[in-house]
C-alpha cells in the first residue's frame, strides 16, 4: 500500500465510513484499492503514476460500472492533505446507494 492508501485504510478500518471494506480486493481480474461490498463501491487512490494511465483507468472504470459497481477515485494528495473531505465525499456516494 502507498502511504495514502494506508492512511485511508486506517480510517476505514476504524469505521470512519460505518461499513466494512476490503483492501486490495480482486474484481474480474483487477486489484482495486478498496471494495465496500454492502454498497458495491470501489474506492481507488490514484497517485502520480495514474496521470499517464488515463485511458486504462477509464476502461477499467467502465468495466467496473458494467458490473454494477460505483467507482470513487481520489488522489494521493487529497487523502494526505484533506482526509476528512475525502471521507465525506465517499459517505455522500454511499448515501446515494
Q: What kind of feature is each model-predicted range?
A:
Residues 1-97:
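Nucleic-acid endo/exonuclease domains
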Amino acid at each position: 500500500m502507498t502511504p495514502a492508501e494506508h492512511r485511508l485504510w486506517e480510517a476505514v478500518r476504524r469505521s470512519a465510513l460505518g461499513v466494512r471494506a476490503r483492501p486490495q480486493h480482486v474484481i474480474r481480474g483487477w486489484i482495486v484499492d478498496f471494495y465496500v461490498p454492502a454498497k458495491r463501491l470501489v474506492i481507488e487512490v490514484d497517485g502520480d503514476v495514474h496521470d499517464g494511465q488515463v485511458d486504462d483507468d477509464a476502461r477499467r472504470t467502465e468495466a467496473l460500472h458494467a458490473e454494477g459497481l460505483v467507482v470513487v477515485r481520489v488522489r494521493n494528495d487529497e487523502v494526505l492533505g484533506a482526509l476528512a473531505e475525502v471521507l465525506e465525499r465517499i459517505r455522500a456516494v454511499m448515501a446515494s446507494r
